[in-house]
From Swiss-Prot:
Principal cellular location given in the protein's record: membrane
Name the UniProt record assigns to this protein: 5-hydroxytryptamine receptor 2B
Keyword vocabulary terms for this entry: Cell membrane, Disulfide bond, G-protein coupled receptor, Glycoprotein, Membrane, Receptor, Transducer, Transmembrane, Transmembrane helix
Effect of T460I: In strain: CA-040, CA-055 and CA-098
Organism annotation: Drosophila melanogaster (Fruit fly)
Annotated effect of mutating A492V: In strain: CA-064, NC-015, NC-096, NC-108, NC-128, NC-135 and NC-137
């Protein structure tokens, strides 16, 4: 029989030698189990067709073409290389997906722990954030691990029952996560548009929202388990493909309820929030304090001040030439009084209420210190016997202030108790070094706040020059804690500088600092507007980028049966959607400083977090 086979093979193919069945090899596998060994020569006895299908020959012809040699091809190296790269791919995929699952679990656990442990985070608004973290935690614990096994094994090997459980949990948790984003957007929209919403946002209302979210997700996820499946569902599982029901009606229902309708609602709500926030920022910027003193007004005021200084020089020369003022009967010293009035109008609103503040006694310094907030006039104060009186001053409106500035036009240089004239800026500089400044700053605050918050009205500054030569003790000393006295010559010299340079210099520089302040406010408001836009863009952008590709693919696969999507692309889109559960803890907490501080306390302990905060301060 062996001879017959040999003859038949030799007759069938001229290229095959007659001794083909005698191969100098130790052994050869035939039909997976048959070995025949004879005197070191292997003799192969098989069916001819089976033999030829399993043995690969490599033909080699010598240079003369007189003989042909056949060698068996060894694919071991190629097979080993392919298996090695498959192993590397599996390990890399397992590491990446495992890290993604771990980060998702840690992030959502941190959010839940922060809300539970930190009392200041236990408010009604954060209940939605906590429920969102629970949904994302379920995605990380129930859905992503089985999905990772599916990807690494390159097929579903866990049976149809587990496939039903996995797909149902997938739809339930992902739908709940997305619908929580809608609930948070609606909550923020109501907070912005309804002033009384903080009173209406009760725990019962928020828990009702959370219940509706989970109930809707449950309906969408359990529909296939009650018969809404396509006919090829079991066939796909047998082919190791575990997918949600591909019934066209169910896919349209599920994708619309899970993604497309929530997407439109989120985009609409955040767009309205952005528009409202932008309008409020612009309105606040318009109400902010903005001095509109023009350059022409400043120039005319400076010219008038120069004329006034020249008049004072002439008056001083007359005094030095021997002109004297009669002495009062009580012997307290001569008084030279001279009044000149100038008006400067600085408009920062529409209301025309005005008030007069006239420099006065020590006991009323706290009341008059409100004028310190208005730094565009140089207030000269005498040491003693000065009277403060206020009239028509409205603390609530702070609409306008008519400041009467007292300055000296002449001085009796021969008076031993000459007055020391100091400017407002010098008072503030000295007063900050003493304890008494705290009480005066309390008086400053209301006016400064009203100006900063954009109070309306016209500020009319009236500057009568009034000088009274009198005895010892200064209001500046009271402001600075009751210390300090000056000599007559030094006071006279200071008067000329402060009355001329102080008032004129401050007045000439009114426009520039407040223009810079207005520009700085505009930049700040623009920065706040950009930050609000960036926050909303990050929230909506992350949601759209993560889930839009998957739901477009899901709807396309159900509507277009002929369309084929590569397995790698389908897996990428699916895990990109899962990645949204990794981002949610970051997006919805990183912009909240309370959450950031809570995370630091959880990571480093309360003492370390407190030390870090004090170091920053």
């Amino acid at each position: 029989m062996l001879k017959t086979v040999t003859t038949a093979m030799a007759a069938g193919d001229d290229d095959v030698p007659a001794s083909i069945l005698e191969i100098e090899l130790p052994a050869i596998l035939l039909n997976e189990s048959l070995f025949i060994e004879l005197n070191g020569n292997l003799t192969q006895l098989v069916d001819t067709t089976s033999n030829l299908s399993q043995i690969v020959w490599n033909r080699s012809i010598n240079g003369n073409g007189n003989s042909n040699t056949f060698d068996l091809v060894d694919d071991e190296q190629e097979r080993a290389a392919v298996e090695f790269w498959l192993l590397v791919k599996m390990i890399a995929m397992a590491v990446v997906l495992g890290l993604m699952i771990l980060v998702t679990i840690i992030g959502n656990v941190f959010v839940i722990a922060a809300i539970i442990l930190e009392r200041n985070l236990q408010n009604v608004a954060n209940y939605l954030v906590a429920s969102l973290a629970v949904a994302d935690l379920f995605v990380a614990c129930l859905v992503m691990p089985l999905g990772a096994v599916y990807e690494i094994s390159n097929g579903w090997i866990l049976g149809p029952e587990l496939c039903d459980i996995w797909t149902s949990c997938d739809v339930l948790c992902c739908t709940a996560s997305i619908l929580h984003l809608v609930a948070i957007a609606a909550d923020r929209y109501w907070t912005v548009t309804n002033i009384d919403y903080n009173n209406l946002r009760t725990p019962r209302r928020v828990f009702l929202m959370i219940f509706c979210v989970w109930f809707a997700a449950l309906i969408v996820s359990l529909a296939p388990q009650f018969g809404w499946k396509d006919p090829d569902y079991m066939k796909r599982i047998e082919e190791q493909h575990c997918m949600v029901s591909q019934d066209v009606g169910y896919q349209i229902f599920a994708t619309c309820c899970t993604f497309y309708v929530p997407l439109l609602v989120i985009l609409f709500l955040y767009w309205k929030i952005y528009i409202i926030a932008r309008k409020r920022i612009q309105r606040r910027a318009q109400k902010s304090f903005n001095v509109t003193l023009t350059e022409t007004d400043c120039d005319s005021a400076v010219r008038e001040l120069k004329k006034e200084r020249s008049k004072r020089r002439a008056e001083r020369k007359r005094l030095e030439a021997g002109e004297r003022t009669p002495v009062d009967g009580d012997g307290t010293g001569g008084q030279l009084q001279r009044r000149t009035r100038k008006r400067m109008r600085i408009c920062f609103g529409r209301n025309t209420n005005t008030a007069n503040v006239v420099a006065g006694s020590e006991g009323a310094v706290a009341r008059s210190m409100a004028a310190i907030a208005v730094d565009f006039a140089s207030l000269a104060i005498t040491r003693e016997e000065t009277e403060f009186s206020t009239s028509n001053y409205d603390n609530k409106s702070h609409a306008g202030t008519e400041l009467t500035t007292v300055s000296s036009d002449a001085d009796d240089y021969r008076t031993s108790n000459a007055n020391e004239i100091i400017t407002l800026s010098q008072q503030v500089a000295h007063a900050t070094q003493h304890h008494l400044i705290a009480s005066h700053l309390n008086a400053i605050t209301p006016l400064a706040q009203s100006i900063a918050m954009g109070g309306v009205g016209c500020l009319t500054t009236t500057t009568p020059s009034e000088k009274a030569l009198s005895g010892a003790g200064t209001v500046a000393g009271a402001v600075a804690g009751g210390s300090g006295s000056g000599s007559g010559e030094e006071g006279a010299g200071t008067e000329g500088k402060n009355a001329g340079v102080g008032l004129g210099g401050v007045l000439a520089s009114i426009a520039n600092p407040h223009q810079k302040l207005a520009k700085r406010r505009q930049l700040l408001e623009a920065k706040r507007e950009r930050k609000a836009a960036q926050t909303l863009a990050i929230i909506t952008g992350a949601f759209v980028i993560c889930w839009l590709p998957f739901f477009v693919m899901a709807l396309t696969m159900s509507l277009c049966k002929e369309c084929e999507i590569h397995t790698a692309v389908a897996s990428l889109f699916l895990w990109l959607g899962y990645f949204n559960s990794t981002l949610n803890p970051v997006i919805y907490t990183i912009f909240n400083p309370e959450f950031r501080r809570a995370f630091k306390r959880i990571l480093f302990g309360r003492k370390a977090a407190a030390r870090a905060r004090s170091a920053k301060i």
